[in-house]
Each structure stands twice: as structure tokens, then as C-alpha cells.
Design a protein with these regions (language model features):
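Hydrophobic/aromatic residues positioned on beta-strands within the core alpha/beta folds
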Residues: 79-80
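Two-component/phosphorelay signaling modules centered on CheY-like receiver
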Residues: 11-29, 117
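Conserved acidic carboxylate
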Residues: 8
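C-terminal output helix
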Residues: 105-114
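Active-site residues of response regulator receiver
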Residues: 52
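Acidic catalytic/metal-coordinating carboxylates
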Residues: 33-36, 59-62
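Receiver (REC) domain active-site loop signature in two-component systems and cognate sites
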Residues: 55
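Alpha4 helix (beta4-alpha4-beta5 surface) of REC/receiver domains from two-component response regulators
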Residues: 62, 83-99
Length: 122
């Protein structure tokens, strides 16, 4: 079973994502801030990471940098509000983000992209 690490401080979004991905057969670990995300990357070795950009303690760009240092091949999907600056999105791709999904998003779209990136990474 593939392990997905979700780093998101909005519990409503976290629960929605977890419900959908568990339905698809994935193991989902949720952490609520960037520092906990860094620690989870080190201890869990996730197959895929989904991260918000704006979070307490560490931001999504720091998450991407750390994830790519630990495992350059791990796919990282960035979830972010439509109001995020374009430069932040471009920087996320520059440092190694695999995909970007604007909030609000459709659970089916997220499910499709997770499946695609896990297949691509294997």
C-alpha cells in the first residue's frame, strides 16, 4: 500500500483528502504544520507528499526543499489558494514540485493526479 503524507493546516481539507485517498486504497498520514511535515518526511519515507504553501512554522517551499534532499524522486503536489502569488508557484516548480492544484479543488481531480504521480514515480 502506498503511503501519502499530507501536510495541511486546514483540518476540513485534510479530512476530505484523507477520506478520498483512503477510499482509493492509500495509507494517508496527516500533519498540521511545516515542522511536523519535515519530521514526518524523515521518519515515514512517504511515496508521495501533498503540501499546502502557507502553514505555521515552515512553509511549503521549505517542505519541497527538504523532501527533495531526502528523496529527489518523491513526487510533491502543492495545494494552494488561488490568491497565492504567481512567483511562489513558479518557485515551487523550480525547486522540485511535481504538480500544483489550486484550492478549492475537486476530490476526483486530486485522486487522478495522485494516481498519475505514484505511477510515474514507480
Amino acid at each position: 500500500m502506498k503511503n501519502v503524507l499530507l501536510i495541511e493546516d486546514d483540518m476540513l481539507i485534510s479530512n476530505l483528502v484523507k477520506f478520498r485517498l483512503k477510499k482509493d486504497g492509500y495509507e494517508v498520514t496527516i500533519v498540521e504544520d511545516g515542522q511536523a511535515g519535515i519530521e514526518a518526511i524523515d521518519t515515514l519515507s512517504p511515496d508521495l507528499i501533498i503540501t499546502d504553501v502557507m502553514m505555521p512554522f515552515r512553509n511549503g517551499l521549505e517542505i519541497i526543499n527538504h523532501a527533495k534532499m531526502v528523496n529527489p524522486k518523491v513526487p510533491v503536489i502543492v495545494l494552494s489558494s488561488l490568491g497565492e502569488e504567481e512567483n511562489t508557484v513558479l518557485e515551487a516548480f523550480t525547486i522540485g514540485a511535481s504538480d500544483f492544484i489550486p484550492k478549492p479543488f475537486k476530490p476526483n481531480e486530486l485522486s487522478f493526479r495522485v494516481k498519475k504521480w505514484l505511477k510515474y514515480a514507480s
